[in-house]
């Protein structure tokens, strides 16, 4: 295959950075354009220090700026779109999430058509499939089953509609007369070094004598390591550029999991951090059905107050459902079409993440010492 170029949106994020680390090892890749609204100074420095002969171009711009996106896409062979706002708590305004996650994706698709970019890979989420009820049980689900989120909450809704737009755009005619090929990857809940979620959990625990706050002791999920999700994106990029593989991939979506054991959100947090003295909150928890109806009451209060005051409930029905359901998926379709096999084993992923948590503990030891006095 001839030399090619790749644009990665959300490149300064948790997943985006890992994709870049793998992309620089790709043969025949001539240029990587890394795009984000703002890059942290340390992230920008890491990009400049990458040991590679591949040209790395750092671009700061807004995904809602259509003209900027069109310029960023000029001469690009593959777009990997990871940029998104992830919020299931209701802290970020609904319209902001819809603008970035849905409108931004639509803008990028149009930029690809105008700039004649032939391949588009969308980082979707398992949230587009559900769960829709804490009573729902999906074990090792797969793509042939019909699972679609019915939540109107901005994150799952925006990701679902963005994925639909991406898959519907497959086969669109490009400005140069070519054809746009698209696919979507639906990773499970992602863990690993530099995870913002894990970082927040650990820092919060350090402020509470090492007790991990409960985020879901009743659910069953299959978390996926960030390095394996990044690897799936690399394989999708290869696949869409391969004339033999592409017909089976374009217009398709894939669940991305790995060999991490099925467990609750609380269990994964504890397993990854117990080496550093963290423990689970042993206090009594309300049953999920009661939490669900309490969440409904809090959401009702929020709605009634909305004309005069923006009240953000401490939890909502969507969050309760996520933390109380059984919802796991197989990666067999990705294995079949993309040639996906987890690059990193569970044991290695656990070790790497635990070691990183150790560095967090070291950085915040002063906080821990102060609390324990």
UniProtKB/Swiss-Prot annotation:
GO terms for molecular function: 3-beta-hydroxy-Delta5-steroid dehydrogenase (NAD+) activity; steroid Delta-isomerase activity. Its EC number is 1.1.1.145, 5.3.3.1. The chain crosses the membrane at residues 288-308. The keyword Membrane applies. One of its GO terms (biological process) is steroid biosynthetic process. The active site is at residue 155. It is found in: Endoplasmic reticulum membrane; Mitochondrion membrane. It catalyses: a 3beta-hydroxy-Delta(5)-steroid + NAD(+) = a 3-oxo-Delta(5)-steroid + NADH + H(+); a 3-oxo-Delta(5)-steroid = a 3-oxo-Delta(4)-steroid; pregnenolone + NAD(+) = pregn-5-ene-3,20-dione + NADH + H(+); pregn-5-ene-3,20-dione = progesterone. Keywords: Endoplasmic reticulum, Isomerase, Lipid metabolism, Membrane, Mitochondrion, Multifunctional enzyme, NAD, Oxidoreductase, Steroidogenesis, Transmembrane, Transmembrane helix. The keyword Transmembrane helix applies. PANTHER family: BIFUNCTIONAL POLYMYXIN RESISTANCE PROTEIN ARNA, SHORT CHAIN DEHYDROGENASE_REDUCTASE FAMILY 42E, MEMBER 2. Belongs to the 3-beta-HSD family. This is 3 beta-hydroxysteroid dehydrogenase/Delta 5-->4-isomerase type 2. It comes from Mus musculus (Mouse). The lineage of its organism: Eukaryota, Metazoa, Chordata, Craniata, Vertebrata. The gene is Hsd3b2.
